[in-house]
């Protein structure tokens, strides 16, 4: 899985959790 990428418009990441604080995948 990838981390650190931007979340999409639905605040979702492909395989990771979206950090709403930084709007990035964690």
Swiss-Prot record:
<dbReference type="GO" id="GO:0005576">
    <property type="term" value="C:extracellular region"/>
</dbReference>
<keyword id="KW-1015">Disulfide bond</keyword>
<feature type="disulfide bond">
    <location>
        <begin position="13"/>
        <end position="25"/>
    </location>
</feature>
<dbReference type="GO" id="GO:0090729">
    <property type="term" value="F:toxin activity"/>
</dbReference>
<keyword id="KW-0964">Secreted</keyword>
<feature type="disulfide bond">
    <location>
        <begin position="7"/>
        <end position="18"/>
    </location>
</feature>
<protein>
    <recommendedName>
        <fullName>Conotoxin Eb6.15</fullName>
    </recommendedName>
</protein>
<keyword id="KW-0800">Toxin</keyword>
<comment type="similarity">
    <text>Belongs to the conotoxin O1 superfamily.</text>
</comment>
<keyword id="KW-0960">Knottin</keyword>
């Amino acid at each position: 899985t990838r981390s650190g990428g931007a979340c999409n418009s639905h605040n979702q990441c492909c395989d990771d959790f979206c950090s709403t604080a930084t709007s990035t995948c964690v």
